[in-house]
């Protein structure tokens, strides 16, 4: 009793404090609860939304020839979206959270009805549902972001129903445009009303069970003549990016005058489109689609592009093809054209597609076929669950196929409800091209023609893993094959199956394997042929315009030009001579990456210049080569494990699948998020401390990495506050505070901001470093004594003065920093030059204008080929 009375007395005395604490806890709980509805349970989803968390290497799985990884987890408590008129100026994400929060507290906001047409009465029940379908544009409305998608008729965002489900709410919160949000809302409302998906699909195939197991390769039968004339092939080349030389090499390898080539270039790849249009003018049987789409990985737009291309190919006068084969620019043949034509001529009634295997339920879950998706804003949004229509025998596994003309005609022109309903189903499906044609064929009258083989060889290195590489464009975990390397060459020569193509090949990753395969098929080039070990890839072309450049690349290319012109001037031996003194004119006209023997050799910058001697305008090309900055400081067994920590090993655009930085040369600006990567030889386990030091000797961060005996690569992106201070940074590796090695990298001092020369003011903060020298919440400056760093004050004063620079003084500082990391390896003249020391670019071995026979297309030879 005494204890009870004492407790009551304490409660009365502190009841205000207790009530306040409980209120705060309740409020925090409500906030966490309301925000959690917008997140996904899956760790990979959180990794996509919180960029500072490294991806879990175990995320995702990959089956042979299938791109989807593990499905997102389900079962989270659903939130709701209740439509309402949006207040002007209120961000959409905040609206979503506010509405969700209000729902949690019990308030109900009814859906906002669509504007009432003049003379039209309000509807309810079935009539209201019918009006909703009509207003949303399905099935008779406008075309949306992808074919068949209901598109809004204005820019207002008004949900026409009460949207239920965490996936739909999350998509609405993350979509960046109101049109996309409205499309998502329309699709979800139709789906909730049961008006979006077909309930059942007719089945015309009388065969039970799965498709044919495949046709083995028979070398003897392959040499026997086929009945009837040789088949003719329509190649559909689906390309994007800037690798025109690799595309030319592919076309050179597969070209024959009896075949037809139709090229679709992604709408975002304007440089490649210009080059392909020019290429197609040389050959009557090569054409470019007069239309272009943005085709994202896993998107419904890819299937739409294929169907439209198929219709085009069927309607080209005089193109009497027998088979449709799709290729990308990263494909390459593994057998000759003669072998392919002979094989298809003996199997002219077969359709070749790769199946996922026997476990249908696992394939459905892994591919997300039981989920509803919609594509808009160049993203595939997961919107909830759905039922697969009755009658469908789901099949698929690869979006690379070889199809007969008769089947293509059936898919494009038929009035069969089977195809129409499957088109509707796959409009809202992830990775539709990996399953649509398989499923149509599996239940169509032509099901007996299906062969389980897509004629491709791919490689999936599970040790390196997919790393959920497409999560920034799809709400799912997926990946693509690894690139082939020289050690894979024997696999490309396999003869057990009739495979005729392999993927993927990337010359910026490894060109040697492309050469090996090319020489194996068509023989070596003559001795002394130039350019066989070189590769060039354009990264900027003048018609792209200044808007295609970032402030970092704009600063860098201008600095490269100035450094190159100083080199040209210094090449003069006669004092006072001005014929080699040039001034740059405008932007560079082009910039290329240059590789030799599969090693990055630097940037080639082509620049229009004016001679100081008042001569005619000229064009020069300058080669800027990166300088190594690795220092191996230790001598222990542990130190010997460190293979490379060199320039380019701190950078951005890290590709964990190929283990390289796609940002070649490590071009970094103050707003970038750099990654440090180390390569290790096998050896004893060790724990390494990594320390980042900025140009003023501020210890920005420190962390430990565990290097197991079998570890080959380690990498980490510390969550540093930005802007980073421009100048030379240092990354040190230590074990027990004894040095193993260090590398330096450059954060480029920007001379441009928003494409304009940097001026004094708030934007000059871009070169002043973070506020209060704080890169992390935790200070690591206490390590400066252990690291024997110089005093901060002199370096900080120099940095303060640099932050005030503009104009030529800022350019001089930028060029000085650049010259510590890049050297001018060569300068040449595109045409005749007044400077006697400049060699013509076409006579050099390194210029982008030097001969490159392996990627040059010429006239068709007597045998109908180019190679």
UniProtKB/Swiss-Prot annotation:
Glycan-carrying positions: 122, 326, 685
Keywords for the protein's UniProt record, in alphabetical order: Disulfide bond, Glycoprotein, Glycosyltransferase, Golgi apparatus, Magnesium, Manganese, Membrane, Metal-binding, Secreted, Signal-anchor, Transferase, Transmembrane, Transmembrane helix
Record membrane topology: Single-pass type II membrane protein
Keyword set includes Cell membrane: no
Ranges of compositional bias, category Basic residues: 73-82
Comp. bias regions, Basic and acidic residues: 53-65
Keyword Ribosomal protein carried by entry: no
InterPro entries: Glyco_trans_14 (IPR003406), XYLT (IPR043538), XylT_C (IPR024448)
Positions on the Lumenal side per record topology: 37-867
Cofactor: Mg(2+); Mn(2+)
Family indicated by similarity: Belongs to the glycosyltransferase 14 family. XylT subfamily.
Assembly: Monomer.
Protein name: Xylosyltransferase 2
Species annotation: Bos taurus (Bovine)
């Amino acid at each position: 009793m005494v204890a009870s009375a004492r407790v009551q007395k304490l409660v009365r005395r502190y009841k205000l404090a207790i009530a306040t604490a409980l209120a705060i806890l309740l409020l925090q709980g409500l906030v966490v609860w309301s925000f959690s509805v917008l997140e996904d349970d899956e760790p990979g989803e959180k990794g996509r939304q919180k960029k500072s968390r490294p991806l879990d290497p175990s995320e995702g799985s990959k089956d042979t020839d299938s791109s989807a990884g593990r499905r997102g987890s389900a079962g989270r408590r659903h939130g709701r979206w209740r439509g309402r008129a949006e207040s002007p100026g209120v961000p959409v994400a905040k609206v979503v959270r506010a509405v969700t929060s209000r729902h949690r507290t019990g308030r109900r906001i009814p859906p906002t009805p669509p504007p009432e047409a003049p003379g039209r009465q309000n509807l309810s029940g079935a009539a209201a549902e019918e009006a909703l379908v009509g207003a949303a544009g399905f099935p008779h409305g406008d075309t949306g972001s992808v074919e068949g998608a209901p598109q809004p008729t204005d820019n207002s965002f008004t949900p026409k129903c009460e949207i239920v489900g965490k996936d739909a709410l999350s998509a609405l919160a993350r979509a960046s445009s109101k049109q996309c949000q409205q499309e998502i809302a329309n699709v979800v409302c139709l789906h909730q009303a049961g008006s979006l998906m077909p309930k059942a699909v007719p089945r015309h195939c009388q065969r039970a069970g799965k498709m044919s197991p495949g046709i083995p390769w028979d070398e003897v039968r392959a040499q026997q003549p086929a009945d009837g004339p040789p088949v003719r092939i329509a190649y559909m080349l689906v390309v994007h990016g800037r690798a025109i030389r690799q595309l030319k090499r592919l076309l050179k390898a597969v070209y024959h005058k009896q075949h037809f080539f139709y090229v679709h270039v992604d709408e975002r790849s304007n440089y490649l489109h210009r080059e392909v249009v020019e290429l197609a003018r040389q050959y009557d049987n090569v054409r470019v689609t007069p239309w272009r789409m943005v085709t994202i990985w896993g998107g419904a737009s890819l299937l739409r592009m294929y169907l439209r291309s198929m219709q085009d190919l069927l309607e080209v006068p005089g193109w009497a093809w027998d088979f449709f084969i799709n290729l990308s620019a990263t494909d390459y043949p593994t057998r000759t054209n003669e072998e392919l034509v002979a094989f298809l001529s003996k199997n002219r009634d077969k359709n070749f597609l790769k199946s996922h295997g026997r476990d249908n339920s696992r394939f459905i879950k892994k591919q997300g076929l039981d989920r509803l998706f919609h594509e808009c804003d160049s993203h595939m949004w997961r919107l909830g669950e759905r039922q697969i229509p009755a009658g469908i025998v789901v099949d698929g596994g690869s979006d690379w196929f070889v199809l007969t003309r008769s089947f293509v005609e059936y898919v494009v022109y038929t009035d069969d409800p089977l195809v129409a309903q499957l088109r509707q189903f796959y409009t809202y499906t992830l990775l539709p091209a990996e399953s649509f044609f398989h499923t149509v064929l599996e239940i169509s009258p032509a099901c007996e023609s299906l062969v389980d083989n897509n004629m491709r060889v791919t490689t999936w290195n599970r040790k390196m893993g997919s790393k959920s590489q497409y999560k920034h464009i799809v709400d799912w975990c997926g990946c693509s094959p690894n690139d082939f390397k020289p050690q894979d060459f024997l696999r490309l020569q396999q003869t057990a199956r009739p495979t005729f193509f392999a993927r993927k090949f990337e010359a910026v990753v490894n060109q040697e394997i492309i050469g090996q395969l090319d020489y194996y098929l068509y023989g070596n080039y003559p001795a002394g042929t130039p350019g066989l070990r070189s590769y060039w890839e354009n990264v900027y072309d003048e018609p792209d315009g200044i808007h295609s450049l970032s402030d970092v690349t704009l600063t860098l290319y201008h600095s490269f030009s100035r450094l190159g012109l100083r080199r040209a001037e210094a090449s003069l031996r006669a004092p006072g001579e001005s014929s080699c003194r040039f001034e740059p004119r405008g932007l560079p006209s082009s910039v290329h990456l240059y590789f030799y023997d599969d090693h990055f050799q630097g940037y080639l910058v082509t620049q229009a210049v004016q001679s100081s001697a008042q001569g005619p305008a000229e064009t020069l090309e300058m080669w800027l080569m990166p300088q190594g900055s690795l220092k191996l400081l230790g001598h222990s067994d542990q130190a010997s494990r460190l293979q490379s920590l060199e320039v380019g090993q701190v950078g951005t655009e890290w590709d964990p699948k190929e283990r390289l930085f796609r940002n070649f040369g490590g071009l970094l600006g103050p707003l970038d998020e750099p990654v440090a990567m180390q390569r290790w030889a096998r050896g004893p386990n060790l724990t390494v401390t990594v320390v980042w030091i900025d140009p003023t000797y501020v210890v920005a961060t420190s962390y430990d990495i565990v290097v197991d005996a079998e570890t080959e690569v380690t990498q980490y992106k510390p969550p540093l506050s930005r802007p980073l201070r421009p100048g030379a940074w240092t990354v040190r590796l230590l074990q027990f505070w004894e040095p193993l090695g260090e590398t330096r990298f450059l954060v480029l001092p920007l001379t441009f901001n928003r494409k304009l020369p940097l001026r004094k003011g708030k934007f000059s903060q871009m070169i002043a470093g973070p506020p209060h020298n704080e890169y992390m919440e935790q200070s690591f400056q206490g390590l400066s004594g252990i690291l024997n760093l110089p005093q901060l004050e002199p370096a900080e004063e120099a940095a303060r003065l640099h932050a005030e620079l503009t104009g030529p003084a800022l350019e001089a500082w930028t060029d000085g920093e650049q010259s510590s990391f890049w050297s001018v390896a060569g300068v040449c003249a595109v045409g005749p030059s007044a400077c006697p020391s400049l060699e013509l670019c076409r006579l050099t071995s390194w210029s982008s204008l030097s001969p490159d026979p392996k990627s040059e297309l010429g006239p068709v030879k007597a045998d109908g080929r180019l190679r």
